[in-house]
Amino acid sequence: MDERLWEWDFEVAEAIACEERRQSRTIELIASENFTSPAVLAAVGSVLTNKYAEGYPGRRYYGGCECVDRVEELAIQRAKQLFGAPHVNVQPHSGAQANMAAYFAVLQPGDRILGMSLQHGGHLTHGAKVNLSGRWFEVAFYGVDPETERIDYDAVWHIAREIRPKLIISGASAYPRVIDFARLREIADDVGAILMADIAHIAGLVAVGLHPSPIGVAQLVTTTTHKTLRGSRGGMIMCDAEFAEAVDKAVFPGTQGGPLMHVIAGKAVALGEALRPTFRTYIERVLENARVLAETLQAEGFRLVSGGTDNHLLLVDLRSHGLSGRKAERVLDEVGITVNKNTIPNDPKPPTQASGIRLGTPAMTTRGFGPDEMRLTARWIADVLRAPDDESVKARVRAEVAELVSRFPVPGVTIEARTGVDDGTV
């Protein structure tokens, strides 16, 4: 944080400092979160936030865009190089905005879509009733096999043949296994549907070849630019050349006005970082840490949905321990371990309570955690969840967590912020 903010707006500075301390003093296991580099933070905090740039490079509705054109072109070219995509739009403000624009590019209100059920690991924007996607379109859902808890591709095929959707959506927010995009494209082709892949969670894995890529398989690919990509918070659409014009028009002027050029600069920086060999090493460590976390929790007696993980996240089923996800989230937060409650397939509890928690390794891998730290973390989670009301257990774990994280700084956070005076807010 710019120290001058303390003079300009003490209340906001205090809130930001509080968050700096919280991030520094906790083990961050929310699967959708990560820590950006100081370079990304610098780009997002730059003077580019002052510039309006409606339109696209070379075709703006405002003057003075020659510099921001360079930034957007860099982001586009780096994304194309990283993913091998024919066309890229880097303007969506978020993953949800990217999905809405992708729908807007190829669908009309009332068209039929087929997406993964939110209760089985899908995402709100894949047709959930509470989302615009569930109000604009006629929606059907597929899910996981009740025994294996993996996507049942034969069932997807049968549903698709029955309802004949115009669009099939692949991708998930809480699915710990590899997604077979090629099989889904076969299903889409069989029923005359377009295939869209939402790779928001696995984009970093896809970028380095550690998860099968949907590029060249799905006609439309959407993603966020944070999560496993470690960039600024935003969205991106990649597509076949035949959909390029429709996608660009769907983003602007279809669903957005001016792009956030400072955020696009952050995307460009992160995409450049992802092109370096060190990024593949990082993703390899993310996957190794997830496997170790999963194996240790299983050894401690916890059941994992689908029996493990192939990617950066895992789902822990808490039913046999008599805990709701909500309580597990709360008691772990009390000891400095941040997770989120999450429904599991066929969950008997409502989403506000949930029967599981979702864990992910991208953030702490960025801070330098390796297998040894993940084993410790898993054992602490087990200790707390086996005795959620035992204050002595929580006090011990809280102290051990604090000592461990003090050795693994958050990128871009100063020593003073990490060890500053405790005001009781964290």
Curated annotation (Swiss-Prot):
GO terms for biological process: glycine biosynthetic process from serine; tetrahydrofolate interconversion. It catalyses: (6R)-5,10-methylene-5,6,7,8-tetrahydrofolate + glycine + H2O = (6S)-5,6,7,8-tetrahydrofolate + L-serine. (6S)-5,6,7,8-tetrahydrofolate binds at L118, G122, H123, L124. GO terms for cellular component: cytosol. Gene3D superfamilies: Aspartate Aminotransferase, domain 1 (3.90.1150.10), Type I PLP-dependent aspartate aminotransferase-like (Major domain) (3.40.640.10). Keywords: Amino-acid biosynthesis, Cytoplasm, One-carbon metabolism, Pyridoxal phosphate, Transferase. Pathway: One-carbon metabolism; tetrahydrofolate interconversion; Amino-acid biosynthesis; glycine biosynthesis; glycine from L-serine: step 1/1. Transmembrane segments: none annotated. Residues 342-368 are annotated as: Disordered. SUPFAM superfamilies: PLP-dependent transferases. GO terms for molecular function: glycine hydroxymethyltransferase activity; pyridoxal phosphate binding. The modification N6-(pyridoxal phosphate)lysine is found at K227. It is found in: Cytoplasm. The record marks H226 as: Plays an important role in substrate specificity. Its EC number is 2.1.2.1. Its cofactor is pyridoxal 5'-phosphate. Belongs to the SHMT family. Catalyzes the reversible interconversion of serine and glycine with tetrahydrofolate (THF) serving as the one-carbon carrier. This reaction serves as the major source of one-carbon groups required for the biosynthesis of purines, thymidylate, methionine, and other important biomolecules. Also exhibits THF-independent aldolase activity toward beta-hydroxyamino acids, producing glycine and aldehydes, via a retro-aldol mechanism. Homodimer. This is Serine hydroxymethyltransferase. It comes from Thermomicrobium roseum (strain ATCC 27502 / DSM 5159 / P-2). The gene is glyA.
